[in-house]
């Protein structure tokens, strides 16, 4: 779905990363919200956008669609492996319930498989410097959920992802 506003959501058990891209001026913003406030935020943005004739595309990262995204290390004990498995399962369920609630309110949701990790950060995740290079985002600091959500919104918009770090293009 093409939109005037793109909302990318990176679901998590405590706080969901929310990235918003307004195509007019390519204005990028991001925040973290708990489950219920995430639903309210999306509904409020859609309501405000519809009043002025804008379309909103909502994209949720569906990590539950990835069977091979392992978080274990060879050194992990059985207890650590069980704890990680529980946490990943809870995160997957949060994402599924988020999609279910949004669809219950008549909101069309696009599911996005996790994007390829090809960045300079730990575990090849995107860094703050890289996301500001991609989006022109002016926030001083960001956490991983915000960066992932912003990247989801940017990717869904179809805008180019060109990164210039230390005068090198990736």
List the predicted regions and their residue ranges.
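Phosphate- and other anionic-substrate recognition elements at nucleic-acid/protein interfaces
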Residues: 1-170
